[in-house]
Amino acid sequence: MSHRKFSAPRHGSLGFLPRKRSSRHRGKVKSFPKDDPSKPVHLTAFLGYKAGMTHIVREVDRPGSKVNKKEVVEAVTIVETPPMVVVGIVGYVETPRGLRTFKTVFAEHISDECKRRFYKNWHKSKKKAFTKYCKKWQDDTGKKQLEKDFNSMKKYCQVIRIIAHTQMRLLPLRQKKAHLMEIQVNGGTVAEKLDWARERLEQQVPVNQVFGQDEMIDVIGVTKGKGYKGVTSRWHTKKLPRKTHRGLRKVACIGAWHPARVAFSVARAGQKGYHHRTEINKKIYKIGQGYLIKDGKLIKNNASTDYDLSDKSINPLGGFVHYGEVTNDFIMLKGCVVGTKKRVLTLRKSLLVQTKRRALEKIDLKFIDTTSKFGHGRFQTMEEKKAFMGPLKKDRIAKEEGA
């Protein structure tokens, strides 16, 4: 038989070539939302860290649909988003060949976790980054120069972006080096943007000032790495029949005799995962507050709802597996997102104008699951577990030893 008697589309997309390891660990924003001067000044992106997944119960609000007013169970991802610190302002001018940086101004005080980003080995370095630059803010000549820079930015720039970094010390991670990124400022005139950014130099910006409840956002990140994989796993090609000589997880024909080369479009073994990807339209189900102290008491009930009044935090019993406890502000997104736990994710405002009913649907959570994610969790809170288990032997022994 000289040819197959049927045709089939190729396996795997060529739109994501080359399938190699990403050169950057933090997701890069390749385009920011279009600016609208009629809106108030706001940021367009934020950085967060993937903590893990859980599930929720909510009531669907979709009049006319069969599922309207019915309860549904949905998977959600928790992304921890501690406030970001603004440390710089960048002005861009539009040229025939695209945007060009015009001026960059850094803040007077920059924390060590941000300075670490400018060194390969912080321990062995002199730690002198920005020491000369920061003196500009102290003498008269430097202050005049900075004022001149700000005025020229107001005059010539069309795009204003801030430089902001994450606060690693607030997270349950070993890493001390902060992630640094430029975030575009949209809304208002250039002068208003610059004044807004200047007011917030060295200040913290919380996530609830960037995103809102029920908003659709895009998540940019690097996927979970899988290492070197064969064609069946990497391209999802069909397995060959059982009796095939020299293996069946292969491609039977890798091309014609001539041209005497293998085409780039033929599925081959190689790197799978750790690719840079942008996923659009992830709905925010909840923007949660971190732990806070009120009247001398630690308040943790950020997973309570109007229907589930139990005093519980978003953390499952034992914490999120391979992450730890979420103690800062967090965002709850519908479904899954790219990357492993602890992976830094870039959250960006949607580039599209959302008009679909599903995108504009109001989310009313009834219940957030906080059972242990390590094994078959049964209990929502520690109190519930203690009430069911009764006094344990180890507790009795500890009590006797104490007495």
UniProtKB/Swiss-Prot annotation:
Keyword Transmembrane annotated: no
Biased composition (Basic residues): 18-31
Subcellular location: Nucleus, Nucleolus; Cytoplasm
GO cellular component terms, A-Z: cytoplasm; cytosolic large ribosomal subunit; cytosolic ribosome; nucleolus; protein-containing complex; ribosome; synapse
GO molecular function: 5S rRNA binding; RNA binding; structural constituent of ribosome
A Pfam family it matches: Ribosomal_L3
Entry keywords, A to Z: Acetylation, Cytoplasm, Isopeptide bond, Methylation, Nucleus, Phosphoprotein, Ribonucleoprotein, Ribosomal protein, Ubl conjugation
PTM annotation (Phosphoserine): residues: S13, S304
Entry superkingdom: Eukaryota
Stored Gene3D superfamilies: 3.30.1430.10, Ribosomal protein L3, domain 3, Translation factors
GO biological process annotation, one example: translation
Keyword NADP listed: no
Cross-link type Glycyl lysine isopeptide (Lys-Gly) (interchain with G-Cter in SUMO2), residue numbers: K39, K224, K226, K286, K366, K386, K393, K399
Subunit structure: Component of the large ribosomal subunit. Interacts with DHX33.
Similarity field: Belongs to the universal ribosomal protein uL3 family.
Chain's role: Component of the large ribosomal subunit. The ribosome is a large ribonucleoprotein complex responsible for the synthesis of proteins in the cell.
Protein name in UniProt: Large ribosomal subunit protein uL3
Species of provenance: Rattus norvegicus
Name of the coding gene: Rpl3
